[in-house]
Amino acid sequence: MLPAGEIGASPAAPCCSESGDERKNLEEKSDINVTVLIGSKQVSEGTDNGDLPSYVSAFIEKEVGNDLKSLKKLDKLIEQRTVSKMQLEEQVLTISSEIPKRIRSALKNAEESKQFLNQFLEQETHLFSAINSHLLTAQPWMDDLGTMISQIEEIERHLAYLKWISQIEELSDNIQQYLMTNNVPEAASTLVSMAELDIKLQESSCTHLLGFMRATVKFWHKILKDKLTSDFEEILAQLHWPFIAPPQSQTVGLSRPASAPEIYSYLETLFCQLLKLQTSDELLTEPKQLPEKYSLPASPSVILPIQVMLTPLQKRFRYHFRGNRQTNVLSKPEWYLAQVLMWIGNHTEFLDEKIQPILDKVGSLVNARLEFSRGLMMLVLEKLATDIPCLLYDDNLFCHLVDEVLLFERELHSVHGYPGTFASCMHILSEETCFQRWLTVERKFALQKMDSMLSSEAAWVSQYKDITDVDEMKVPDCAETFMTLLLVITDRYKNLPTASRKLQFLELQKDLVDDFRIRLTQVMKEETRASLGFRYCAILNAVNYISTVLADWADNVFFLQLQQAALEVFAENNTLSKLQLGQLASMESSVFDDMINLLERLKHDMLTRQVDHVFREVKDAAKLYKKERWLSLPSQSEQAVMSLSSSACPLLLTLRDHLLQLEQQLCFSLFKIFWQMLVEKLDVYIYQEIILANHFNEGGAAQLQFDMTRNLFPLFSHYCKRPENYFKHIKEACIVLNLNVGSALLLKDVLQSASGQLPATAALNEVGIYKLAQQDVEILLNLRTNWPNTGK
């Protein structure tokens, strides 16, 4: 709503009468329009609220007010209201005249739409009837057409079936023609096409066609295979295959200059032709597979020419190592294992030089030597799978078998390059029953060896005691033998095919370490009364050595891989906390951490016991030194030469003897920990029990400093460059007690007047005091008796 002043304000005096009148008329018209709009809105609002008299009263009050002069505006207001009323009436008339027209137009449109809809419905009904009539008329035609289409499709299937048969027969006829003309290479190539056709037909549901196809392939495959195998065996016989003799004598019969090139050329031809039969051979021949419990890796069949080359060796193997032959003895697995290794070695040169080039020439990725080894390996695996159940519960026979198999595996991989991804004897040993038996036997024999090594007379003597450079760790024989045992166990299981099996062996090793630690603890307890004795020190050296070696092993790649495998197992089973899993994953911990922590705790306990023992004896030897008359000793100027206090001799001698004894019996790292622990206790003891318990004159302070700096500290100069840094309490106490009087007085004044820590610390540092607190220095100053008579 516009203010009343704006609506009824009189116009400004015009500069020009004409222009002023025009402006006045325009302003009046605009004011009237605004007033009409606003007034109508106000009136509607007022009437809506049901309070029209109040609205009129308020409007008059606002426009006229109490000013009598403003009554002149009434004519103008009446005129404005009249104009507004007329405009509103015109709007009402306009609206009332337009609405019926719109309604009539809408009704007309609706009527037209209804007519169109009715027309469409009539057309739809007519069309629906026509379509139904057409469908009824066309249905017999559709039925006839469907029958014809079905017949055509059936005929097409018959034609396709006949085409397949024709194609098979054509290939079969071609093979027959090639064989009649002795064209074996083309016959072999055609058989390859037939085998590929067989593979394409595998998805068909035509069982008779598939049977016919397979029977045809089988028929020609047998004929070609028999012929080529016979020819190939004949040519191999001319080469004196197989080579039973050692490699150096294999050239006999092969170096005939006239026939050798022809033989090898024919060998290559037959080899390639046999290789072509590989596809059909794989279709027809089910490869021999050991039971699934052995979890052998999937592998293709040995290529056909190598199979033929392996046949005489397979016959020999089965002849000698099956049945009741004298060579088939459960207690002698090394016989057939050594025989297989010998065969591989005897034929390696021929396979690499004569057969591999043929495979390379035809673009095959097969390695002849490894393929040959794989074929022989299957004989070994079958033999092991047969023999192991027979000797599973005879510890000696089973252990011997495992030893021989591990030696065989080592030579097979290291000498002959047999890949770890191929099927191997370790897969047989990993079978659940066999593996658990292996673990049991391994544990049993390991415990027996531990018993024997600990009961040996030389158990606690180092093998290298007379060789200084080698004997730094001073390792007793039992500890070194035990770690060698663990190392051998690692070598035995590191080639197992699965991480889970390796982790089970790792747990066995950890159990053995814990068992050995317990045995060492038992022996140690028997030697507790002689904690400085040779055997006690040997046990301590053993504990330290085992802990050190395990820490080194933790960084070995093999054990890091096992740690990662263990992490995955623990994560799957939720057997560790998130913190422990995080430590394993970040390599902050290792698989041996639990064992190392237990060994370190045992080492610390044993060292503490030794330190306590020596410290007790040192305290006993220091009784006279504690009672020294420090108050009445002559000053340094009164003595010609300073000498060691006689009462300190027992203390220093006891200390020296024990240090020499333990230096000889403990390894360097242990002895370093020992003397540092001892020095820490000795420093506090002398400071508290001797220095703080006495008063010192000038001579007493000088004598104490001489005894400490010239006699006690040098005892440890063999083990470190600055031994005084390990006796900080004694060293700084001697500094305070031996300050000249002026410096001591000045320091005392500074300490007494120091308001803050900084000034006192600076003063203490200036005289070389870093360890002792301000209160300790004040106590030491009060222990001095050589103060001047100044009241201080």
Curated annotation (Swiss-Prot):
Residue ranges the record marks as coiled coil: 103-124
Every RINT1/TIP20 domain range: 220-792
Cell compartment(s), UniProt: Cytoplasm; Endoplasmic reticulum membrane
GO cellular component labels: cytosol; Dsl1/NZR complex; endoplasmic reticulum; endoplasmic reticulum membrane
Gene3D superfamilies on file: Dsl1p vesicle tethering complex, Tip20p subunit, domain D
Keyword Membrane: yes
One Pfam family, short name: RINT1_TIP1
Bilayer topology term: Peripheral membrane protein
InterPro entries: EXOC6PINT-1/Sec15/Tip20_C_dom2 (IPR042044), RINT1_Tip20 (IPR007528)
Region ranges (Disordered): 1-22
One of the protein's GO biological processes: mitotic G2 DNA damage checkpoint signaling
Disease: Infantile liver failure syndrome 3: A form of infantile liver failure syndrome, a life-threatening disorder of hepatic function that manifests with acute liver failure in the first months or years of life. ILFS3 is an autosomal recessive form characterized by recurrent episodes of acute liver failure often triggered by infection or fever. Affected individuals also have skeletal anomalies of the vertebral bodies and femoral heads.
Protein name: RAD50-interacting protein 1
Species of the source: Homo sapiens
Protein encoded by which gene: RINT1
